[in-house]
């Protein structure tokens, strides 16, 4: 409660005088009174209607069920009328408390007059002649202070009591018979247990995301004030939201019961399977039947899933089958490659035809070997030009060029008709490739070299007693003109002169002794220094 004594009376008087007044409270009380009268009028009308039903032509159990279905709603109307009337009375009480507080509160004029009188008395208090009037004035101001504080405290207590005692109107019950409610949902289990903080968090998130259009009450199990079971149209998006919340709460309840009482947990889940899930499946089927497009999409997804399942089943059946044995090819002796011998013919006309005609006799054995498999392809006509004779077979396909045989032939060679011919051709190609990849190795018996550090008289030495011929002249035999065939020789290029004897220079008599190994004896090897007996 507010400590009203701490404030001067001017504050309380100003608050009451400057407020909106009792007009708004009395207006609210009038609205509540009219609402109470409306509820009472509807209740009276319903009572008359139910009485007419019971006394009219409608007789039997259905009429009684109709009256019984409206009984809760009729009771709610009468209770709502009483609640509204009581709320109106509470508003009138608050308005009366405000009016009383304003009447009991010292006015600002009275307070101002007290302050003015106090100032005059103090100003004219010569020799203390106004002491008693000043004391009386101050006592009157203290009375107004206490009166203002007590008035505000009383007004606060009456207003708070009226607001706290105002009854709350409950939601209207549905007008349904007990049998109809059971037919709508044939189970009496509870979707979820006690609400958890996570449930309230999810409810707040739904409210924020939907902009206040989805209000989930975890304690009551309602969505927008309507129970979950009243949402039966699966074509509406809110139905799926409600079902998602319902299934999550069902799973939460099952897990909680599983740790407390497993028997009740499985009994709860069994009730869901028997009563809850079939009801929702029927609702989905009804929604799909009303929308052919959704039905086509649902059937398409089901058919595609069935096709995938049957496909995997077929693959599993194939996994159990034994693969058929593949017959092995009979080994065929590879025909030895024959090299066509080409005659040296300097002819210039039709070199391709000449080579083909010369190679025909030599390739006859190979053709006879595989004659049973396939006939030999006709020779490809060659282009006009110089024909270079070869002593070996010309380069085949894959030798050095990436071109295929069809690039120079007018038509393709016929394919072999049997596996034996293909095997023979593959063997020939493998042997040819092996020969091309073979490398020449040096013989092992050519690794010794001759030692020249021995005394041996050369065979080209002069006879005993004669001087050696020291002059070396250029040979008059040449190697001829070198270069590529078909090129012209330039006459300005001088021919090689060979080895010549250098003439003596101005500083010596002639060429000096060349640099020789230290193991050679120059005196012994000089001309004329050796004795005839030593040469023997």
From Swiss-Prot:
Which residue ranges have biased composition labelled Basic and acidic residues?
521-536
Q: Which GO terms describe its biological process?
A: response to host immune response
Record-linked Pfam families: PPE, PPE-PPW
The cross-references to InterPro entries, in alphabetical order and at most eight, read: PPE-PPW_C, PPE_dom, PPE_sf
Superkingdom of origin organism: Bacteria
Q: Which cysteines are joined by disulfide bonds?
A: none
- Name the segments for region: Disordered: 501-536
Q: State the family it belongs to.
A: Belongs to the mycobacterial PPE family.
What is this protein's name?
A: Uncharacterized PPE family protein PPE3
Q: What is the lineage of its organism?
A: Bacteria, Bacillati, Actinomycetota, Actinomycetes, Mycobacteriales
């Amino acid at each position: 409660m507010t400590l009203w004594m701490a404030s001067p009376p001017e504050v309380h008087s100003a608050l009451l005088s400057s407020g909106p007044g009792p007009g708004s409270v009395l207006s609210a009380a009038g609205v509540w009174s009219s609402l109470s009268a409306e509820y009472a009028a509807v209740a009276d009308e319903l009572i008359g209607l139910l009485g007419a039903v019971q006394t009219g032509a409608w007789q039997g159990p259905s009429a009684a069920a109709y009256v019984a279905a409206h009984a809760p709603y009729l009771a709610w109307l009468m209770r709502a009328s009483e609640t509204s009337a009581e709320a109106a009375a509470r508003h009138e009480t608050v308005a009366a408390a405000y009016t009383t507080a304003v009447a009991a509160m010292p006015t600002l004029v009275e307070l101002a007059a007290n302050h003015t009188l106090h100032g005059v008395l103090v100003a004219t208090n010569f020799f203390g002649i106004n002491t008693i009037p000043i004391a009386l004035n101050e006592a009157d101001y203290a009375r107004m202070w206490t009166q203002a504080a007590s008035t505000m405290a009383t007004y606060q207590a009456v207003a708070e009591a009226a607001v706290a005692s105002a009854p709350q109107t409950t939601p209207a019950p549905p007008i349904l018979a007990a049998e109809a409610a059971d037919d709508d949902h044939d189970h009496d289990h509870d979707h979820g247990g006690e609400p958890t903080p996570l449930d309230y968090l999810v409810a707040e998130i739904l409210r924020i995301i939907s902009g206040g259009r989805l209000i989930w009450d975890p304690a009551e199990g309602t969505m927008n004030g309507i129970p979950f079971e009243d949402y039966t149209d699966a074509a509406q998006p809110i139905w799926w939201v409600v079902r998602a919340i319902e299934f999550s709460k069902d799973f939460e309840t099952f897990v909680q019961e599983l740790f407390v009482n497993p028997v009740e947990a499985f009994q709860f889940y069994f009730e869901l399977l028997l009563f809850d899930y079939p009801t929702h499946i029927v609702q989905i089927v009804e929604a799909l039947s009303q929308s052919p497009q959704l039905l086509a999409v649902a059937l398409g997804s089901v058919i595609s899933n069935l096709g995938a399942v049957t496909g995997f089943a077929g693959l599993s059946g194939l996994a159990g089958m034994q693969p058929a044995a593949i017959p092995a090819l009979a080994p065929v002796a590879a025909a030895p490659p024959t090299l066509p011998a080409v005659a040296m013919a300097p002819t210039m006309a039709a070199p391709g035809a000449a080579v083909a005609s010369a190679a025909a006799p030599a390739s006859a054995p190979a053709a006879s070997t595989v004659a049973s498999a396939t006939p030999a392809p006709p020779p490809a006509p060659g282009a006009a030009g110089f024909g270079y004779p070869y002593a070996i077979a010309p380069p085949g396909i894959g030798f050095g060029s990436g071109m295929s045989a069809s690039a120079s032939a007018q038509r393709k060679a016929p394919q072999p008709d049997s596996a034996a011919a293909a095997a023979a051709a593959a063997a020939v190609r493998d042997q040819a490739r092996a020969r091309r990849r073979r490398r020449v190795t040096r013989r092992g018996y050519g690794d010794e070299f001759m030692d020249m550090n021995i005394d041996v008289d050369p065979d080209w030495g002069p006879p005993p007693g004669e001087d050696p011929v020291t002059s070396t002249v250029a040979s008059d035999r040449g190697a001829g003109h070198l270069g590529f065939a078909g090129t012209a020789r330039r006459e300005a290029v001088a021919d090689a002169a060979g080895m010549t004897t250098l003439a003596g220079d101005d500083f010596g008599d002639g060429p000096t002794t060349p640099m020789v190994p230290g193991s050679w004896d120059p005196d012994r090897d000089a001309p004329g220094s050796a004795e005839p007996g030593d040469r023997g």
